[in-house]
Amino acid sequence: MDYTKKILYQSNYWYNDGLRKAQIRDMSGAVTSLRRSLQYNRENIAARNLLGLVYYGRGEVAEGLVEWIISKNLKPRDNVADYFISEVQESASELEIINQAVKRYNQCLVYCSQNG
């Protein structure tokens, strides 16, 4: 087995390990394995997308977006990262709408307390 195949094998091994850990919700272990996979092959799109998804699942949205954007740059066509990025962008606009409603509600409470 030549050197390149060994590196790809190692990358796939760590990706599969990260996938198993993500399936049982061991998110910290999944991050470690997926990062190791990317150390062997930084162009492992599946590992990069899964790492982004794990970050997103942990509430680290910015880190997830970074991984998906890198993935999108490495493989511009037919990449599931497009879906993840668009979902985050859509949820960000929904979050902003909710945030504005909360601000208005709080302002109404201030007005009520001033007249009471």
Regions found by a protein language model. Name each.
Residues 1-13:
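TPR-adjacent "capping" and linker segments in tetratricopeptide-repeat scaffold/adaptor proteins
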Residues 5, 38-39, 70-73, 110:
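Conserved structural position within tetratricopeptide repeats
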Residues 23, 57, 90-94:
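Register position in tetratricopeptide repeats
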